[in-house]
Design a protein with these regions (language model features):
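Repeated scaffold domains used in trafficking and secretory/extracellular systems
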Residues: 1, 29-41, 69-80, 114-124, ...
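Short beta-strand elements that form the blades of beta-propeller/WD-repeat-like
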Residues: 1-10, 14-16, 35-48, 52-55, ...
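Short solvent-exposed loop/turn micro-motifs enriched in small/polar/acidic residues
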Residues: 8-9, 47, 69, 92, ...
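Short acidic/polar, Gly/Pro-enriched loop/turn segments located at secondary-structure boundaries
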Residues: 11-14, 19-23, 30-33, 50, ...
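Short secondary-structure boundary micro-motifs
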Residues: 19, 27-29, 37-39, 82-83, ...
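A short beta-strand motif characteristic of beta-propeller blades
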Residues: 20-28, 60-67, 105-111, 154-160
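Asp-box/WD-like beta-propeller blade repeats and closely related beta-sheet repeat scaffolds
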Residues: 62-84, 88, 94-95, 102-119
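Solenoidal tandem-repeat scaffolds enriched in leucines and small polar residues
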Residues: 93-172
């Protein structure tokens, strides 16, 4: 639930309903791997491994993103202020994270060439983004959590997670 209604996503697309049951917005399309991520105010519905993403807030669809070429969505997370972190396979990188503000404008893109980006989340204050990465050194897999200020493409902090596989991420 959002403060203004409920969003569902399925193989038939994404639907936004008001708290009174009124149909507020929808995106009807075939979705292979439907995923929904939500905060108190905003929901993002997307097709993991594909190219379509939709953001719902305040009773309407507020933003949409369609990747092109061989770029595909891996994850998308939204904070309570409506800022969005999109992790994607992007040509020329092992992974990339793009942060969008609450108006759908791109703030920063972080391209990673030596490790894979698997997930990301924007801080509650919209000042930084946490990025989960995976890589391999001398045959051993490793994970790291990288913290980036939104005005820098180099991390300000790095947390080595060893061989742990991160299954979920929240920036509180």
């Amino acid at each position: 639930y959002l403060d203004s209604g409920a969003v569902t996503v399925s193989a038939a697309g994404a639907h936004y309903y008001g708290l009174n049951g009124e149909h507020l917005a929808e995106e009807v399309l075939s979705v292979e791997n439907p995923v929904l991520s939500a905060s108190r105010t905003t929901a993002v519905a997307y097709d993991a491994g594909n190219q379509s993403l939709f953001v719902f807030r305040g009773g309407a669809e507020s933003f949409r993103l369609s990747l092109t070429g061989s770029n595909n969505l891996l994850s998308a997370r939204v904070n309570n202020s409506g800022w969005l972190a999109v992790t994607a396979q992007q040509s020329g990188f092992k992974g990339a994270v793009t942060v969008y503000n609450s108006h759908g404008r791109e703030v920063i893109t972080i391209g990673l060439s030596s490790v894979f980006a698997v997930d990301a989340a924007v801080s509650p204050d919209g000042q930084s983004v946490a990025v989960v990465t995976m890589g391999q050194e001398q045959g051993d897999f490793f994970s790291r959590l990288l913290l980036y200020p939104l005005d820098q493409t180099e991390p300000s902090r790095q947390v080595d997670l060893g061989a742990l596989t991160v299954l979920d991420l929240a920036y509180e």
